[in-house]
């Protein structure tokens, strides 16, 4: 929004031309989202407490989690508000990348909100029925996938980038829609499964978003893209604004979500942030890289799949409890130890993912 105002004011003072630089707006976007989260966080927590919107804790979970019962949830509303305000202020509203991301965040945030509302306000422990949640996620993801495929302006927007291989970038054709669908829905649910400990999901989300900010910037410059053998995607630099807004909002939320948490993000936060990471990966053509950098999310998801599959096929569980972070809790690891070690793994995987841009 302010890009247009700055463009007009440049006629009178050339210093306003600085707003045309993505890097400058990205920094302002990060700071805006961060300050907004820190400023409004206490007010939201107080409001959630007054409304008695507290976390529902499963009775078969670790005993240490019983103390979390009643902790304010749906804090993802704070994250989404910070991201929306930041992106609307500093993003180029003429960019299709910006509107796609706002739709992703809004639609999946709405699905998560309905789920949270049924759990904590309606006191329905099951929340939104899994079948309906998946149907709504699928509708949103397919709408996005079809739109991106139909509006692709150059071949690079529908290629598949394969890490470690310099010139392996096959055209996907209609398979693009299938890959985009599974990436967005899968990432949304993976982050949702990871959000089980204080700060466990938000920090890896921030790390992956920061890495994608760099990748989006490189993809938007033809020289960097050609040098790194990644698709050149004109205009993808606007995704940097979205990514840094996620980083700022995430760090601001972590201030209140760190152990012991004052607020949880709820499904309204985890489903929308996960979908956002998936959508960004699709937009910059780095779906496989998301699997590497978001390895913590993948690990959590795979642990649930293995646990359920093993129990149904053999009648035995592989882990003491799934997702896998609960397994380590039941082994006696203190919650902060589990969280920090998963963060360390996430840092390693994000750096490994970035290294693949050059290791080809």
Swiss-Prot record:
GO terms for molecular function: metal ion binding; phospho-N-acetylmuramoyl-pentapeptide-transferase activity; UDP-N-acetylmuramoyl-L-alanyl-D-glutamyl-meso-2,6-diaminopimelyl-D-alanyl-D-alanine:undecaprenyl-phosphate transferase activity. HAMAP family: MraY. It catalyses: UDP-N-acetyl-alpha-D-muramoyl-L-alanyl-gamma-D-glutamyl-meso-2,6-diaminopimeloyl-D-alanyl-D-alanine + di-trans,octa-cis-undecaprenyl phosphate = di-trans,octa-cis-undecaprenyl diphospho-N-acetyl-alpha-D-muramoyl-L-alanyl-D-glutamyl-meso-2,6-diaminopimeloyl-D-alanyl-D-alanine + UMP. The chain crosses the membrane at residues 26-46, 74-94, 97-117, 134-154, 168-188, 199-219, 236-256, 263-283, 288-308, 338-358. It is an enzyme of class 2 (transferase). Its EC number is 2.7.8.13. Belongs to the glycosyltransferase 4 family. MraY subfamily. Its cofactor is Mg(2+). It is a multi-pass membrane protein. It is found in: Cell inner membrane. InterPro entries: Glycosyl_transferase_4, PNAcMuramoyl-5peptid_Trfase, PNAcMuramoyl-5peptid_Trfase_CS. Pathway: Cell wall biogenesis; peptidoglycan biosynthesis. It holds the Pfam family MraY_sig1. This is Phospho-N-acetylmuramoyl-pentapeptide-transferase. The keyword Nuclease does not apply. PANTHER family: PHOSPHO-N-ACETYLMURAMOYL-PENTAPEPTIDE-TRANSFERASE, PHOSPHO-N-ACETYLMURAMOYL-PENTAPEPTIDE-TRANSFERASE HOMOLOG. Catalyzes the initial step of the lipid cycle reactions in the biosynthesis of the cell wall peptidoglycan: transfers peptidoglycan precursor phospho-MurNAc-pentapeptide from UDP-MurNAc-pentapeptide onto the lipid carrier undecaprenyl phosphate, yielding undecaprenyl-pyrophosphoryl-MurNAc-pentapeptide, known as lipid I. The gene is mraY. Its main location: membrane. Keywords: Cell cycle, Cell division, Cell inner membrane, Cell membrane, Cell shape, Cell wall biogenesis/degradation, Magnesium, Membrane, Metal-binding, Peptidoglycan synthesis, Transferase, Transmembrane, Transmembrane helix. GO terms for cellular component: plasma membrane. One of its GO terms (biological process) is cell wall organization.
